[in-house]
């Protein structure tokens, strides 16, 4: 099977270790187990005693019930039988395509987005059609263009909400209109929702699974809950044919997700409100820092993110984004992601949810590099 190189991951793998100012990171500032117990008030001794007494078997093959129950609390209409645990959201996306998409199937995906959403189905021989998101439309899908791309042969529409890399957020009304387009073709909607709940304004972030019977939500413990080291995600859907197919295909390459990961994730999700409060505080304070910097730096511009942890920032230098980001890294230690990883030239993705001082110092380093190039 041929597949395009995963541009973002190859870039991160090559440069992340050793970065002086890591503002390419997309998870909310990660926490330790000690931090988790302190934040949640969970009894560490009691938890560790239960964990140490647990036999290290495969565990619950279809997922620890307490973990799946915790995941259900992130939605309005799901029960534990609607949840399929996976190794991260990347594993969840892969399992959805592996389970549902065949050669010749028509798949419509937005761009820019996480590359999995178009490169994996393309590698399986799907007819992948791209719906380009524009800066002029605040990176929201143009519904007329989507209608033209969706045909009776369309098997799946792939979206990402909130969007990576732009931070755009689709409203419930917009999602409902996309649902009607999908329903006209009896197509699934796969929505990568790893940044859901991280909006800049208070209120419930709608999920595709609460709006559409053929909606498939993918998420994880990594971005919002700062627990990427657990490598634990999930597929959520009301469509039990999808659940059945994903579990069947999962038997071939995953079996189960691991006793330790699911126990710790279940403990975290019992106290999700406390973790979400921490994460929202970080992204809201840090976005203000980023917004102030964009306003003061004459050579950059962006559409201010509505949610998530990332922003797509344009620069006005006549230099490719790979060259810009690599040279800047070597000269200043500032680590960002080239926009060309998302097929958006003359831009960079900045992750603003990591350490506040890293963000401040990293943005200063970007300004120093730009000043160096524009003298």
Regions found by a protein language model. Give the residues of each.
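Structural signature of PLP-dependent enzymes
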Residues: 243-250, 268-291
